[in-house]
């Protein structure tokens, strides 16, 4: 399970150094094999260990290519999916087209989200966090049953 937000730097070749605390799990559970794709709802990237991505891929394969919305989701997620391998130094090379999509330059936030990571431009990440907090503070509608059960 991946959790927490960590500031990492992309080097001049577009590689990011994966924090040590995640490397053992990625090597043990995925042999360092990852898949990176775009997030279709936010200006960030999604980074999955290969076994987790294969579950997503299986779900995508069951969508209908005849349904325009389902086809669009397939096209966006699969069309941008790029395999990357954790190298001996614990780095991942993020494809240029993906870096460009998310506006990633040097300082990047690696955000754990249970079974995957999100990769954000640092400034965009902090802006999103502020927007999310503001949205939560202004909620006037009833919480879903699942959120009501979440006691923090």
From Swiss-Prot:
The keyword Repeat applies. InterPro entries: MraZ (IPR003444), MraZ_C (IPR035644), MraZ_dom (IPR020603), MraZ_N (IPR035642), MraZ_sf (IPR038619), SpoVT-AbrB_dom (IPR007159), SpoVT-AbrB_sf (IPR037914). SUPFAM superfamilies: AbrB/MazE/MraZ-like. Residues 5-52, 81-124 form the SpoVT-AbrB domain. GO terms for molecular function: DNA-binding transcription factor activity; transcription cis-regulatory region binding. It is found in: Cytoplasm, Nucleoid. Transmembrane segments: none annotated. One of its GO terms (cellular component) is cytoplasm. Keywords: Cytoplasm, DNA-binding, Repeat, Repressor, Transcription, Transcription regulation. The keyword Amino-acid biosynthesis does not apply. Negatively regulates its own expression and that of the subsequent genes in the proximal part of the division and cell wall (dcw) gene cluster. Acts by binding directly to DNA. May also regulate the expression of genes outside the dcw cluster. PANTHER family: TRANSCRIPTIONAL REGULATOR MRAZ. This is Transcriptional regulator MraZ. It comes from Escherichia fergusonii (strain ATCC 35469 / DSM 13698 / CCUG 18766 / IAM 14443 / JCM 21226 / LMG 7866 / NBRC 102419 / NCTC 12128 / CDC 0568-73).
């Amino acid at each position: 399970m991946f959790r927490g937000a960590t500031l990492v730097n992309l080097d001049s070749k577009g590689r990011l150094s994966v924090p040590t605390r995640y490397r053992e799990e990625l090597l043990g559970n995925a042999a360092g094999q990852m898949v990176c794709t775009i997030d279709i709802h936010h200006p960030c990237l999604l980074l999955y260990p290969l076994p987790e991505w294969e579950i997503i891929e299986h779900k995508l394969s069951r969508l209908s290519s005849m349904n325009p919305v389902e086809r669009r989701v397939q096209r966006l997620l699969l069309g941008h999916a790029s395999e990357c391998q954790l190298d001996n130094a614990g780095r991942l090379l993020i494809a240029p087209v993906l870096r460009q999509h998310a506006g990633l330059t040097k300082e990047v936030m690696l955000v754990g989200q249970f079974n995957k990571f999100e990769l954000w431009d640092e400034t965009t990440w902090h802006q999103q966090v502020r927007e999310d907090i503001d949205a939560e503070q202004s909620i006037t509608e009833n919480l879903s049953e699942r959120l009501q059960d979440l006691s923090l």
